[in-house]
């Protein structure tokens, strides 16, 4: 059991026997009313999204999900097939099931993912917090524009755009924080 004030992104709740993922949680306390938690939830079985408000002391059922290591095996249209690294079982997910990690998924990636299961059914995939990706296009840095932290847009192999430091060049590998889509530095790859 969790209370409303303990909710945070990544928490999974059981509401009407379905697992709901907390995607965003914002704690609000006003002088007149009691504290509340505004949340954005996603149903892991249907993909339906909603916004809900909970009181700080509301009791909520949390769910413990099973997790297994997996790798991306192949992509076929909007279908993504992952393979369990221990018993080589194949699992398939649609693009809408993994919309949060979609910008980082690309054919041939070697990252170990976490396959997330609810009652034996694969419902989502989570990536490591730091991944390495190759920059395929970026502009040259503007000369003399060096006061402070200077960033510029860069395009990755799968088409995702990210803000990188001005010294990053085309074909370099960079580390990305998947929690907030931020540039961490050059990769050691």
From Swiss-Prot:
Pathway: Protein biosynthesis; polypeptide chain elongation. One of its GO terms (biological process) is peptide biosynthetic process. The keyword Protein biosynthesis applies. CDD domains: S1_EF-P_repeat_1, S1_EF-P_repeat_2. It holds the Pfam family EFP. GO terms for cellular component: cytoplasm. Coiled coil: none annotated. The keyword Ubl conjugation does not apply. It comes from the Bacteria. It is found in: Cytoplasm. Its main location: cytoplasm. HAMAP family: EF_P. Involved in peptide bond synthesis. Stimulates efficient translation and peptide-bond synthesis on native or reconstituted 70S ribosomes in vitro. Probably functions indirectly by altering the affinity of the ribosome for aminoacyl-tRNA, thus increasing their reactivity as acceptors for peptidyl transferase. Belongs to the elongation factor P family. This is Elongation factor P. It comes from Pseudomonas putida (strain GB-1). The lineage of its organism: Bacteria, Pseudomonadati, Pseudomonadota, Gammaproteobacteria, Pseudomonadales. The gene is efp.
């Amino acid at each position: 059991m969790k209370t409303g004030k303990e909710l945070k992104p990544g928490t999974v709740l059981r509401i009407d026997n379905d697992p709901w993922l907390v995607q965003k949680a914002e704690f609000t306390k006003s002088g007149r009313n009691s504290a509340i938690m505004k949340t954005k939830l996603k149903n892991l079985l249907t993909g339906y999204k909603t916004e809900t408000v909970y009181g700080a002391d509301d009791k909520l059922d949390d769910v413990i999900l099973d997790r297994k290591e997996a790798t991306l095996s192949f992509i076929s249209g909007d279908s993504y097939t992952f393979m369990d690294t221990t018993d080589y079982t194949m699992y398939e997910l649609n693009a809408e099931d993994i919309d949060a990690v979609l910008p980082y998924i690309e054919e041939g990636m070697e990252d170990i993912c976490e396959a997330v299961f609810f009652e034996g059914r694969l419902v989502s995939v989570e990536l490591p917090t730091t991944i390495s990706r190759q920059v395929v296009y970026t502009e040259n840095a503007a000369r003399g524009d060096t006061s402070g932290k200077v960033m510029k847009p860069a395009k990755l192999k799968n088409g995702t755009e990210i803000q990188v430091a001005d010294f990053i060049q085309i074909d370099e590998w960079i580390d990305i924080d998947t929690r907030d889509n931020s540039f961490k530095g050059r990769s050691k790859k």
